[in-house]
Amino acid sequence: MSPSPSRGALSALLATILIWAYSWVVMKQVLAYAGPFHFAALRYLLGAAVLFAALLLSRQSLRPPPLLPTLLIGLCQTAAFQGLEQWALLDGGAGHVALLAYTMPFWAVLLAWLLLGDRPTARHWVGVGLAAIGLACIIEPWHDMGSALSTTLAIAGGAAWAAGTVLSKRMFHRHAPPVLNLTAWQMLLGGMALGLLALAVPERAIEWNLAFTAGLIYSVLLASSLAWWLWSIVLQRLSTTVASVSSLGVPIVSVLLAWLILHEQPSAMELVGIVFVLLGLLAVSGVGARRRG
């Protein structure tokens, strides 16, 4: 891998972490004004519209990538992941749900090994182990984890995202679709599935006000359209292990933002866990190894 693509992927990863970290706070706030499935469907259908507009403006092809794998990616990565996490946020704190959702890397590492032959190195296993210890310290499964339903939904959403991540990586390996094209089509298909779910599940009417509209705009333009496009770039250029474990930066920043904005104060154990996760990220990224080299 040349330095330039790698640097571009790392820049995309950093931007994605910052955008998604704040989006958990936004999602928690907007659910005071809308049901989880209606909001998720709106967010992703509008996000897909933005991406298709970007395709038109950049004069890229609107022809869909291979339909079945694109549909599977959309169902896992958009419909299942976002639907389950939005549902979990109804009873769970933003920081806590974000942390449970980011069990994703551990599922992704195993799925990538089984389905892609992307076998982790010894350094990767060390990083995964440190991050797992950190996540356990943050979640504290030996204590009351709050709503059992919220916890289960958040973890299931993380597993669905892992499946979408590995399927996306396999799509890039086998078919090499343009990143923006794949992101737009999987978001449209996943958003349509969320739309059908929103129609089938009775929910409160959306309360259209300034707070909801501002949250929806952030979610559509940044957290959906821009961030998922950047995430696809990351998956295209980095290994599944490095990309997925590095995404643990999102819940770390999310916990800190939830502390500052929603007053969900982290415990001492959560702060210890954050340190372990950061050590795991350093191990997986190989920063120290590159410097010694």
Predicted segments, located by residue:
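Glycine-/small-residue-enriched transmembrane alpha-helix faces in small-molecule transporters
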Residues: M1-H38, H143-R170, M192-A193, R292-G293
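Specific transmembrane alpha-helical segments of multi-pass solute transporters/efflux pumps
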Residues: I19, S23-W24, F52-T103, L111, ...
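Small-residue-rich packing faces within the transmembrane alpha-helices of Major Facilitator Superfamily
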Residues: A21, L45-A49, A132, L188-M192, ...
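Hydrophobic/aromatic residues within transmembrane alpha-helices
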Residues: V30, F39, R43, A88, ...
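Specific alpha-helical transmembrane segments that line the substrate/conduction pathway
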Residues: H38-A49, Q77, Q82-R119, H124, ...
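Helix-helix packing/entry segments at the starts of transmembrane helices
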Residues: A40-L42, Q82, V97-T103, L167-G191, ...
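Transmembrane alpha-helical segments that form core, pore/gating elements
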Residues: L51, A108-L110, G146-P202, L216, ...
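Hydrophobic transmembrane alpha-helices of multi-pass small-molecule transport proteins
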Residues: L51, L111, P120-E140, G158-A159, ...
